[in-house]
Amino acid sequence: MNRILLEVCVDDPDGLEAAVAGGADRVELCSALCAGGLTPSPGLMSAAGMPPVPVYAMIRPRAGDFVYDAADLEVMRRDIDAARAAGLAGVVLGASRADGRLDARMLTKLAGHAAGMGLTLHRAFDLVPDFAEALEIAVELGFERILTSGGAKTAPEAVEILEKLIAAASGRISIMPGSGITSNTAGTLLPRLAIAEVHSSCSTSEPANDMRLVEMGFAAPERRRTDAAKIRAMRACLDALAAKA
């Protein structure tokens, strides 16, 4: 098995530095990972244009569902412009209809606006009622990969579904498992899944250092911090699993 690419999601400058230091192959740049990841600020995008690994910006203007209107579309277009201006390698997109199916029209507009940049379809995919239909939409629109947990809370819970998605993709698009993947759980995915890349937060939970911030609504009781040591452990785990395959 070839070397498996490791994508790490981060939401602040320290996380970006840790991802590079730990050996991540690609970074998904966000804000508010506690809400599943939102669009990073232009300032953070600009800072991320310098690392020696490809960086993809999450384009998600708000928490909650992925059903977007014309005003959301305009915001996302401007966010894509900011990612391009910062020199980022790509963007992470997703949009749904009210019935949960992918919004092909909205995604066509977003993907078109991001022409020339790399494209990842985010976990709006995990909410669709028909994976086969959604996969074909992603292929048709030129997405490089689908980030997915197989519709489950975590990817290790949906290995059989991920196997089916990989078979259906048939090399036309990468299926990148994400959610709940750590150096302790990666062995449930590999070598069973013929994948080229995985997505992980490689983070550590830390309690808030000032409870006044929590009491006043400025911070959550705990936060996740990207951990370079966990990235190194994940990298070593993936390399060991690939060597055995």
Curated annotation (Swiss-Prot):
Coiled coil: none annotated. GO terms for cellular component: cytoplasm. Keywords: Cytoplasm. It comes from the Bacteria. Its main location: cytoplasm. InterPro entries: CutC-like (IPR005627), CutC-like_dom_sf (IPR036822). It is found in: Cytoplasm. PANTHER family: COPPER HOMEOSTASIS PROTEIN CUTC, COPPER HOMEOSTASIS PROTEIN CUTC HOMOLOG. This is PF03932 family protein CutC. It comes from Sinorhizobium medicae (strain WSM419). The gene is cutC.
